[in-house]
From Swiss-Prot:
Keywords: Membrane, Transmembrane, Transmembrane helix. It is a multi-pass membrane protein. This is Uncharacterized protein L282. It is found in: Membrane. GO terms for cellular component: membrane. The keyword Transmembrane helix applies. The chain crosses the membrane at residues 2-22, 26-46, 92-112, 128-148. It comes from Acanthamoeba polyphaga mimivirus (APMV).
Amino acid sequence: MENLIVAISNFPAVLPIGLSFLKRDFITFGTITFVSIASFISHLIENHKHGMPGIGFSQQTSYIWNRFDVLGCILSVARFSYLYYNRHGLTVVPIVNNKWLFAMTIPVFILLRVSEYDKYNPNLKTRYIITHCMWHAGIFGLMYYFLKNIVY
């Protein structure tokens, strides 16, 4: 059940996925779809860290799917960087002037760091579940906001 909770917390990905689809930006659509599916599967079978039980796959399989999740994150950063550069060049003014985006990015990434702190200590599993679910909601919300207000 714990794995399912963290896996389902990827649901907010439908916002940036839907927006990129409506804007006919199929590369971004594919990138966000990839990371959200990889994250969903990774968290569903996760049993190699955080004391999560998984759903019966080996720890090696859990680790490999976690690497797919990380790959999706890297691809997403690359894609969003490309979109930003194409629209704004090297200036950071649109980000710095957008106080909401600037202010929300910091706590969202703090949630990620807190959720991944001491990932091999099963006593921190509850903290991991809560903060990682909040990370998913936050990062996909930021993706949507960034696409809608900075890129498109």
